[in-house]
Amino acid sequence: MMYHIPGVLSPQDVARFREQLEQAEWVDGRVTTGAQGAQVKNNQQVDTRSTLYAALQNEVLNAVNQHALFFAAALPRTLSTPLFNRYQNNETYGFHVDGAVRSHPQNGWMRTDLSATLFLSDPQSYDGGELVVNDTFGQHRVKLPAGDLVLYPSSSQHCVPPVTRGVRVASFMWIQSMIRDDKKRAMLFELDNNIQSLKSRYGESEEILSLLNLYHNLLREWSEI
């Protein structure tokens, strides 16, 4: 399943990020890509050795960790270190699949269950550059407002078509979920959404408490901690 997570960063935060990224050191995006991806990747990334990068990636981690909808959809166990990329002048990233595991500075290795892109450019400011994802439901083309994030299974083939006008800047990361199975995770997300909707409409009740009990028992049964 694919999820749109709005408002991860406020407009003020986005503007500050963009201003700081204008001063960043950018390097060839292939430095963080395996052999397969390097053949189709042509973009730039912020140098991960820079002081600015360390500060910005911490802010992204704090923002996603505090976003209730992100947590409900991803049920994250481990988040990768966020990276930042830039596309301009017909730069592109052809169809590829993210690696199944990635190194992690604290945990050694992590499994990539979900991929996330946090958009930092106004969609009207550039042409092309949509995130194109192929999954069992067909092809999806995603171009969200700055500050919004999209979550999708890391097992999906995806690409970024050439940016023919303007500049597309984004942050991206991977998530190892407490729930490995996409279908089980989607069911828990739907159940959680319905519980929250019923609570806001009718207040607390024995029936809602029973559904909460069901949710947590399923999470307890399926989670890998």
Swiss-Prot record:
GO terms for biological process: DNA damage response; intracellular iron ion homeostasis. One of its GO terms (molecular function) is L-ascorbic acid binding. Pfam families: 2OG-FeII_Oxy_3, PKHD_C. SMART domains: P4Hc. Its cofactor is Fe(2+); L-ascorbate. Residues 78-177 form the Fe2OG dioxygenase domain. Its EC number is 1.14.11.-. It comes from Shigella sonnei (strain Ss046). 2-oxoglutarate binds at residue 168. Keywords: Dioxygenase, Iron, Metal-binding, Oxidoreductase, Vitamin C. Binds 1 Fe(2+) ion per subunit. Fe cation binds at residues 96, 98, 158. It comes from the Bacteria. This is PKHD-type hydroxylase YbiX. It is an enzyme of class 1 (oxidoreductase).
